């Protein structure tokens, strides 16, 4: 019972960190562009997180049980590794994929315990992690090219429509993060009403108290994005994460979105994109996974 409470507490802490940190990914653009206020953005993010968790969170059940034995001892180690890695990355101001750290540590712990995870699932995860960024870049690039070659006749009316669509895209991004990343955490913890309630509370706490400093436009740090570009990047990445959720594969929202931002930037030949932040993120994707695996294996 005591170990269960410790595990749930660690799960709550990780949920708080994930919710607050990833709010910039889902609603940072609409808040930063002043389409809506911060608190409205927080409300959209919270509603999206919780809706995704409740409606599709169970989709990650097999992945959670196949990657890590259902032992509160092992689960608590995986969660502790992820929390520690996140705190260190925050102090170093380095981007980090919590999803990849958590998956990597789960695999490392399983192998250390003498259990080989489902190889078919591992291949599917690796394939999705490679294919998703490539597809996100391609979709964003081609979609923006089409819009550039076929500019709207009524610019103001289109801008208003794009603002509304961008809000929808932000909600959908929050929804897929709740279904995938938070759903994976829910199933690692074993699910149930107690765990679900604790996670919902964690979502609210993280979104309200940890989002103020991180609601930044991810796209604007790499590229000055238009409404259309931001909408396409958000929708393409969210759709890919939704597909991964349906397939039962944990996938990082920031991974897909960062790739989508690059695709949008590459579509504009007259404006250069700063590729260094994206290359840094790609490097941390790889490091995050292997760091999680290494720590999970040796602990």
Outline where the language-model segments fall.
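Multi-pass alpha-helical transmembrane bundle typical of ion/small-solute transporters
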Residues: 1-299
């Amino acid at each position: 019972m005591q170990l269960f409470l410790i595990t749930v507490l660690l799960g709550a802490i990780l949920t708080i960190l994930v919710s607050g940190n990833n709010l910039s990914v889902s609603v940072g653009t609409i808040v930063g562009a002043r389409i809506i206020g911060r608190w409205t953005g927080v409300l959209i993010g919270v509603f999206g997180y919780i809706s995704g968790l409740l409606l599709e969170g169970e989709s990650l059940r097999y992945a959670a049980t196949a990657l890590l034995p259902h032992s509160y001892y092992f689960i608590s180690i995986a969660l502790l590794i992820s929390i520690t890695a996140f705190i260190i990355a925050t102090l170093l101001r380095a981007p980090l994929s919590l999803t990849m750290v958590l998956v990597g540590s789960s695999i490392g712990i399983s192998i250390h315990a003498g259990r080989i995870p489902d190889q078919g699932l591992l291949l599917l995860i690796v394939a999705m992690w490679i294919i998703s960024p490539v597809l996100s870049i391609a979709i964003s690039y081609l979609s923006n090219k089409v819009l550039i070659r076929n500019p709207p006749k009524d610019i103001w009316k289109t801008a208003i429509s794009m603002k509304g669509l961008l809000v929808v895209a932000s909600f959908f991004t929050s929804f897929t993060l709740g279904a995938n990343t938070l759903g994976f955490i829910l199933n690692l913890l074993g699910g149930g009403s107690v765990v679900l309630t604790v996670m919902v509370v964690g979502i609210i706490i993280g979104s309200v108290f940890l989002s103020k400093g991180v609601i930044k436009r991810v796209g604007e740090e790499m590229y000055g994005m238009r409404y259309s570009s931001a909408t396409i990047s958000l929708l393409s990445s969210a759709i890919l994460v939704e597909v991964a959720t349906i397939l039962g594969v944990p996938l990082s929202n920031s991974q897909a979105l960062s790739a989508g931002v690059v695709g949008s930037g590459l579509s504009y030949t007259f404006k250069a994109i700063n590729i260094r932040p994206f290359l840094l993120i790609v490097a941390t994707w790889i490091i995050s996974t292997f760091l999680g695996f290494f720590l999970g294996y040796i602990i």
